[in-house]
Amino acid sequence: VVEFSIGMGPRLWSTEKGETRYSIKAFPFGGSCMMLGEDENESNPKAFNNKPVWARIAVVAAGPIFNFILAFLFGIVIVCAAGYDSPQLIGVSDGFPAQEQGMQAGDRITKLNNEPVVVYRDITLYMLLHPTETIKVEYERPLEDGKTMEKRTAVITPKYSEETGTYMLGIMVSGQYRPANGLAEILKYGAYEGIYCIKTAIKSIGMMFRGQVGMDDMAGPVRMVSIIDDTVKETIPYGIETVILTLMNLCILLSSSLGVMNLLPVPALDGGRLVFLFLEVVRGKPI
């Protein structure tokens, strides 16, 4: 490894140990690992280009994979400390489709048009992307014993609300996070924090290619520094624990998005390198 860097942009600090330079750079997002022979042919047997193809695939894939692992670990911490946003209803709005279809407080939404719903954010994301679409809502209703769940289905067309200026199903949730019960739920919802952000990043990329999201909606390093600064200022009045958890939540979003972006099959990114390496596996020789 020629240089191992934390962050991007101009180098703020560095030191050399052995054959490797360790650097901290100006923008605290991501990082890089510059290896000998990564972009040019080297005769040194230690060089990247002289390693077996599966070793090179493992090295290139490690970056995005560890982005996802970091998001998973932060997700577990957040769920342990704050819980998760349950898709269980506390009520329905008068005159809206959910009430007309017989939904009520206590119902827990499980699917929207066959897309799984794990947390309430899944519902808000789906409504953001499909505001006027007729939706097959699958949900569970607790029976009298409080443990047995009855599976139900409703077909709902969102109704426009003059008050909010949006299309609504007419469902209400508490907005409060619910504690996870036991290790299984902590792992489930902790992992889903990262999965949700990965899913959102993939959908956002699709919207970008379809022209639904413009370049003005994208955030570069300078804007991200501004967002972090604003986030810290807004959460400081609620205590240091809230600041840390909010920054962790932001790190999950950044790490997941960076992992997804790096896997795009673009030559300058890890995904592009992986395409050429897998082609090398198929052909039996470098391209």
Where are these predicted regions, by residue range?
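Small-residue-rich helix-interface/hinge motifs
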Residues: V1-S43, M261-L269, L274-R283
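Conserved PDZ fold ligand-binding element
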Residues: A98-Y120, G194
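PDZ-domain C-terminal substructure recognizer with occasional recognition of PDZ-binding tails
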Residues: Q104, T110-K111, L125-M172
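Alpha-helical transmembrane segments of multi-pass membrane proteins
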Residues: M34, N67, A71, L253-L263
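Internal alpha-helical transmembrane segments
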Residues: T20-S23, F27-D94
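Conserved hydrophobic/aromatic pocket- or pore-lining residues that grip, position, or stack substrates
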Residues: V137, G194, N262, V266
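Short helix-capping/hinge motifs at transmembrane helix termini and TM-loop junctions
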Residues: F74, I78-G83, R210-G211, K233, ...
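Functional transmembrane alpha-helices
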Residues: A47, K51, T157-L258, V275-I287
